[in-house]
UniProtKB/Swiss-Prot annotation:
Keyword Lipid metabolism: yes
A single BP term in Gene Ontology: lipid A biosynthetic process
Gene: lpxB
Origin superkingdom: Bacteria
UniProt keyword annotations, A-Z: Glycosyltransferase, Lipid A biosynthesis, Lipid biosynthesis, Lipid metabolism, Transferase
GO molecular function: lipid-A-disaccharide synthase activity; phospholipid binding
Record family assignment: Belongs to the LpxB family.
GO cellular component: membrane
Record pathway: Bacterial outer membrane biogenesis; LPS lipid A biosynthesis
NCBIfam families referenced in this protein's UniProt entry, alphabetically: lpxB (TIGR00215)
Record protein name field: Lipid-A-disaccharide synthase
HAMAP family: LpxB
SUPFAM superfamilies: UDP-Glycosyltransferase/glycogen phosphorylase
Length: 382
């Protein structure tokens, strides 16, 4: 029996964790018992969820401080289960502030730690590399440049490929999708993706809805509900906004993106998904002012959107903090809806990003390559 602790605190990490668990079961010569932190996708993949990701998913320094007692309690709940089950290996997926503390605690218990999906140490708070050096057995990274970064810092690292580089979606017939959600197939459809955490949505959604108001009723607006949230809560957020336009909640972000003519997307994994699926979008983001002031002192980047970082230049427009206004979002989305030079340029740019993400692919999936590394670490005696 191979016992694995898997921890993913966000929707994107949970998606990678579920795929990794499937790959582990496929490749492991022994039965796999998995437990940890996650949500419905990981539960469906057979992981015994000890801590639900909804209970620890907060964003920004000010927000984290407000929820520290609850997060502390869930942290120790997970550790108690690790003490009871004694896993052969732990896989921590992104979510660095929580996971670096967890890595330290697991290391002290003699449990080897594999970190899957690197925090952006190359962008900010590089001092955290010391935590990786001390407590992480191996880094599994999803961007090629990250492998070199870690090796330069004497950390064992492997580029497994980006799971989303393999992303393909069977596109539902437009008429079928329209009937399912009561949409007008003659109108352009615009995706609204405000993030996967409650505080994030509360900071971002009102401005996106204001942008939709400015764009007007000539479009249909689709809002997929992340697995870390629920439709009732999201509907309540919409109802709290004065005179919102008609917004349709959907259950599948990828299908929503591939069906959308253009999209407004919060910074994060959804920007990579939109790039791979070829949906033109504008990236937006906002955090609490305190979080922003502290973050700007630490971040070493001029760009924030992952597609822009991958390409090394602006491929999509990014509107962050005070630059994130309804007028600017509406203007960019309007240009992306129209068959004009802006839409054509962004589509060309996104094709280049897809090439970067798909480079170095083999016959194995990214999850399978990651699973082989996890199995190797679990079997090592060093």
């Amino acid at each position: 029996m191979l016992k694995v602790l898997i921890s993913a605190g966000e929707a994107s990490g949970e998606m990678y964790g579920a795929a990794l668990l499937d790959a582990l079961r496929k490749l492991s010569p022994d039965p796999v018992e998995a437990f940890g932190l996650g949500g419905e996708k990981m539960r469906a993949a057979g992981c015994d969820i000890i801590v639900d990701s909804k209970d620890v998913a907060v964003v920004g320094i000010a927000e984290v401080v407000a929820h520290l007692p609850r997060i502390y309690g869930e942290f120790h709940k997970l550790l108690r289960e690790a003490d009871r089950r004694k896993p052969d290996v732990a896989v921590l997926i992104d979510f660095p502030d929580f996971h670096f503390r967890l890595a330290k605690a697991l290391h002290a218990r003699g449990i080897p730690v594999v970190y899957y999906v690197s925090p952006q140490l190359w962008a900010w708070r590089r001092g955290r590399i010391k935590l990786v050096q001390r407590y992480v057995k191996k880094m599994l990274v999803i961007f090629p440049f990250e492998e070199q970064f870690y090796r330069e810092h004497n950390v064992e690292a492997e580029f497994t490929g980006h799971p989303l580089g393999e992303l393909s979606v069977t596109v539902d017939p437009r008429t079928e999708f329209a009937v399912r959600y009561g949409l007008d197939p003659a109108k352009p459809w615009v995706g609204i993706l405000p993030g996967s955490r409650r505080k994030e949505v509360q900071m971002i959604l009102p401005t996106l809805i204001d942008a939709a108001k400015k764009l007007g009723p000539a479009n249909e607006y689709l809002l997929p509900v992340a697995s870390t949230l629920d439709a009732g809560w999201m509907q309540a957020q919409l109802l709290a906004i004065p005179q919102p336009p008609r917004v349709t909640l959907t259950s599948d972000a990828r299908q929503t993106l591939v069906q959308s003519r253009a999209a407004m997307v919060a910074s994060g994994t959804a920007t990579v998904e939109a790039s791979v699926l070829g949906t033109p979008f504008v990236m937006v983001y906002r955090v609490a002012p305190l979080s922003w002031r502290v973050g700007r002192r630490l971040v070493k980047l001029d760009r924030f959107a992952m597609p822009n970082l991958i390409a090394g230049r602006e491929v999509v427009r990014e509107l962050v903090q005070e630059n994130f206004t309804a007028d600017k979002v509406a203007a960019e989305v309007s240009a992306l809806i129209e068959d004009g030079p802006r839409r054509a340029q962004v589509l060309k740019n996104l094709a280049e990003v897809r090439e970067h993400l798909q480079s170095g692919r083999t016959n194995e999936s990214a999850a399978e390559r990651a699973a082989r590394s996890v199995l190797s670490v679990a079997q090592r005696k060093d």
